[in-house]
Amino acid sequence: DGRITVPGFYDDVEEVPQTEREMIAHIPFDEKKYKEAIGVKELFGEKGYSTLERNSCRPSFDVCGIWGGYTGEGSKTVLPSKAYAKVSCRLVPHQDHHKISQMFADYILSIAPDTVQVKVTPMHGGQGYVCPISLPAYQAAEKGFEIAFGKKPLAVRRGGSIPIISTFEQ
């Protein structure tokens, strides 16, 4: 169903409000052009959500890289003794990066064969944040945009690596 299979991953994820889903549905978006731009034949992800919703309002689990063994030119027949992977998660409000890191580590250890050694090293993390469009600062920015460009901006969530924002809110 396109969901992340780490047990408990979605426990603290709030459903996207219907009003926001309707706003997202009105954003001009050409899925065919998007697929061409990123060089894929098909898009996939959590069922029941549009591509824009999956890219903005829903958490993600991303494999950033996998490597191990011989990676130079030519072929080798030696089995590698080590393999590595770098993964990241885009979290949404109310998901705690410490909790998610622990759930991921517990899950990987639970599915790994007893014959291998597994080490999970959390690197860093930040809390998700959504700026309410009812916030006076947002409304002032929206009004300024409308004055400058002659039309209202579209309210679009964008996942990003600005973990300090949730600290500003607090």
Give the residues covered by each predicted segment.
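Metal-dependent amide/peptide-bond hydrolase catalytic core
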Residues: D1-E169
